[in-house]
Amino acid sequence: MGRAEAAAMIPGLALLWVAGLGDTAPNLPRLRLSFQELQARHGVRTFRLERTCCYEALLVDEERGRLFVGAENHVASLSLDNISKRAKKLAWPAPVEWREECNWAGKDIGTECMNFVKLLHTYNHTHLLACGTGAFHPTCALWRWATAGGTHASTGPEKLEDGKGKTPYDPRHRAASVLVGEELYSGVTADLMGRDFTIFRSLGQNPSLRTEPHDSRWLNEPKFVKVFWIPESENPDDDKIYFFFRESAVEAAPAMGRMSVSRVGQICRNDLGGQRSLVNKWTTFLKARLVCSVPGVEGDTHFDQLQDVFLLSSRDRQTPLLYAVFSTSSGVFQGSAVCVYSMNDVRRAFLGPFAHKEGPTHQWVSYQGRVPYPRPGMCPSKTFGTFSSTKDFPDDVIQFARNHPLMYNPVLPMGGRPLFLQVGAGYTFTQIAADRVAAADGHYDVLFIGTDVGTVLKVISVPKGSRPNSEGLLLEELQVFEDSAAITSMQISSKRQQLYIASRSAVAQIALHRCTALGRACAECCLARDPYCAWDGSACTRFQPTAKRRFRRQDIRNGDPSTLCSGDSSHSVLLEKKVLGVESGSAFLECEPRSLQAHVQWTFQGAGEAAHTQVLAEERVERTARGLLLRGLRRQDSGVYLCVAVEQGFSQPLRRLVLHVLSAAQAERLARAEEAAAPAPPGPKLWYRDFLQLVEPGGGGGANSLRMCRPQPGHHSVAADSRRKGRNRRMHVSELRAERGPRSAAHW
């Protein structure tokens, strides 16, 4: 049995094998920016309403330049260019009587008995379709947001109708839907108790259809995630709607207990239901397992909790790429993954064998009997047959479709494994959006992944060896919400190069790129491997594909600056920093690379020595994330220390520090000279000029960074010790502020 067959019928893969991943360290981003840094330097914008939560529904309208937001008791229209300005909001609360009924049913009137807007769709050129929970009375409405001439306008709901089967009752439940023409396809819970799970079609001219109720073979406690309309051919009669969800696996062995799996389901858009059986039910519904796992010798490690799916369109509308984020359901370890699927692989699974179980005590197997014609799951059209309607399907086709909705073979990810993994990072992936970017050496897919701690990860998919295998590289980690609220929805505008992120507490907007934060040197810009950015000869700026590509330096595939930046002379001269220490004391040599993925190496050149030797960790030497700590200083520690960042095999000097180790007597002379000096007016102190005379008679004007730590002699008074400790602390703090700088500033 191959891996595909083993993954399909689960008993052998119900266990989560973590032998190969349990000790895996989380991937570090090259650049990490806090909310404060984004706010101060990179233009993060936020929107929130007073006493309102749960911004779950986002809709981008590129034509009108608006972002529509659905939240608790409100629908808002924001500018795509700046969500903080020109916001228009309309209240849509649940009626008082509905809230009272909700409260009488045992729900909390303050947190549950509200109208939580879950669904927003563009209905036509002037109206939106919005649906909300309505205090456990699902309701939908058409909202006018533009005039016939295109002018932006906003009024209240013009047409109200029952939202049952369109949006959930309970605000804790997710809604997944797509509007195709005037038809709404939804995956929801259709009852107050949250037990009637259904895939439902409403609105439009075709009859309303749903899945078979209370049949675990069709749906078994599903959690709906996303819905897409994807054409199958040039004939619109072949169009299908694809549902992505997770559910309890009916095919799991009883001994394994309850097990969650991810699914992709399909229905035909022109399905009209059956004539004698499956009346007002789907006759073309099929589902297959969606696998995202890491192969291993002892078994596969499964990421079985589907969280979100993004459809990245291509030139051929029939073959988009599907990017999906998953998490684990195991308590053994915490992990998330991104898997990529092709529509050809999805269709291949639905054309494969059906899953079959003869009886309650039998195992699930591949169906070996005769499959009726037309094949269940095929749409009635002239492309694949002569049937013009599902009502014309023979009874044996309808009966087979009712009893065999599950496919035997799963859908495996491209490359056979996840594109990107994050294990033990302290967060879970919740949302994903993608953008296809033209770079100097090809086109690249850039992923934006939302987490449950309010961060967005920027990941690029690059070829790994021979195509089509790819790997994901983590470029950035951005804290877009100050309160670390979980990200619940994301929308992307490739046209405006903006990302819109929603959480329970607010909506945020960030640009897709921050080229100036990548560095001030050609090598830094090239090592970043950001397809949005390139070195223009003087700065890291936005890359625009033009005919003059030779003037822009960019290498996304390899990230190798050795050739591209060989002629770059900017910032090639390191400023020399002087650091002072006292025998038997300590000295801290600060050097923190901009990239968290860089490895720092230290070399030392003693006085009178021609060669640099590598500084190794020992009892007196401690490496830290921010630099090198030297303890028990000796006179022979004086010399030149060079800090070099190594990344992707490329070495880049960061800092050159000259350490002078002084005797206790020299340090004492300095202290007494300072105490005898008259108080200086406010401003920079120049006492170090006298101090440098002890080290460099006749010089010392070039010292722009000083730090001294010395032991306290035992014969000094306590008061003198206190004064010196305070003086040293002031000296350390002032130098730290001068030298550290922000993470987005260069160190030389």
Curated annotation (Swiss-Prot):
Segments forming domain Sema: 30-512
SMART domains for the chain: IG (SM00409), PSI (SM00423), Sema (SM00630)
Keywords: Developmental protein, Differentiation, Disulfide bond, Glycoprotein, Immunoglobulin domain, Neurogenesis, Secreted, Signal
Record's compositionally biased regions (Basic and acidic residues): 732-742
Primary site of residence: secreted
Disulfide bonds listed in the record: C102-C113, C131-C140, C268-C379, C292-C339, C515-C533, C643-C709
Domain of life from the UniProt record: Eukaryota
Glycosylated sites: N82, N124
Cleaved signal peptide residues: 1-25
One GO location term (cellular component): extracellular region
GO MF assignments: semaphorin receptor binding
Domain called Ig-like C2-type: residue spans: 561-659
TM stretches of this protein: none
Gene3D superfamilies reported for this sequence: Immunoglobulins, ligand-binding face of the semaphorins, domain 2, YVTN repeat-like/Quinoprotein amine dehydrogenase
GO biological process, one term: cell differentiation
Function, as annotated: Inhibits axonal extension by providing local signals to specify territories inaccessible for growing axons.
Family: Belongs to the semaphorin family.
UniProt name for this protein: Semaphorin-3B
Organism phylogeny: Eukaryota, Metazoa, Chordata, Craniata, Vertebrata
